[in-house]
A protein has these predicted regions:
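Small-residue helix/turn framework positions
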Residues: 5-189
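Short, low-complexity, Pro/Ser/Thr/Gly-rich segments in the mature regions of secreted, periplasmic
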Residues: 192-203
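Exposed regions on extracellular, virion, or secretory-pathway luminal proteins
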Residues: 1-2
């Protein structure tokens, strides 16, 4: 983070800090008043953010983020909107590509919204992503930052293929399980449709 420009205000028992800084390829604005912190990050680089947080790079995009937190209650909200991004090749995209027979890294996501509730060191998140051919959603994903544990179910659809991927255990190296019921069901339906067409031609 580069130099922060701002001001410090102190009156009676109230203490307030306002600041602005160029960071992560974008701009940080924040206000901290007593136990409450409000911050916005505009047009930041997600790859730079991943590096700063010591997480593997998995997505390339610019993002607008808001963060509200009460340090006394240890509760807050984190919301983000990523702009026209795409996945970087990783273990998740490799698995996704094997299941869907499509290349996820070539999909450009016009919509990528994430909303998280913070309760002490636990984040509960919902995520929605959409591109021309792909839709990915996550509901009530749990990330325990203190224990570095994750419990999440990813619902994915690319073109006519649907499946679910569950992540559990260590956040940086989670156990992965796959629910292929919808994918198998769709393949069976396609096979039945092909057989129906052949029967019609013979008839």
């Amino acid at each position: 983070m580069r130099n922060i420009n701002g001001e410090i205000l102190s009156k009676n028992s109230s203490f307030e800090v306002n600041g602005k800084s160029n960071t992560l390829g974008g701009v940080l604005d924040f206000n901290s008043k007593n136990e409450k912190l409000n911050a916005t990050l505009k047009n930041i680089d997600i790859q730079e953010l991943s590096t700063m947080m010591n997480y593997p790079k998995f997505f390339d995009a610019k993002a607008n983020l808001t963060f509200d937190y009460d340090s006394l209650l240890k509760k807050g909200n984190f919301n983000g909107n990523l702009l026209n991004g795409h996945f970087i090749e990783n273990s998740f995209t490799t698995l996704f590509n094997q299941l869907s027979k499509e290349d996820l890294t070539k999909e450009v996501f016009e919509t990528f919204d994430i909303n998280s509730k913070i309760d002490d060191r636990i984040l509960t998140s919902n995520l929605n992503m959409k591109s021309q051919n792909t839709q990915i959603s996550i509901e009530d994903s749990i990330l325990n930052l203190e224990k570095n544990l994750i419990d999440s179910k990813i619902n994915a659809k690319i073109k006519d293929n649907s499946f679910a991927i569950a992540l559990s255990g260590e956040a940086l190296n989670p156990k992965i399980s796959i629910d292929l019921k919808d994918l198998i069901k769709e393949k069976i339906i396609k096979q039945l449709e092909k057989k129906k067409k052949k029967i019609r031609k013979i008839a």
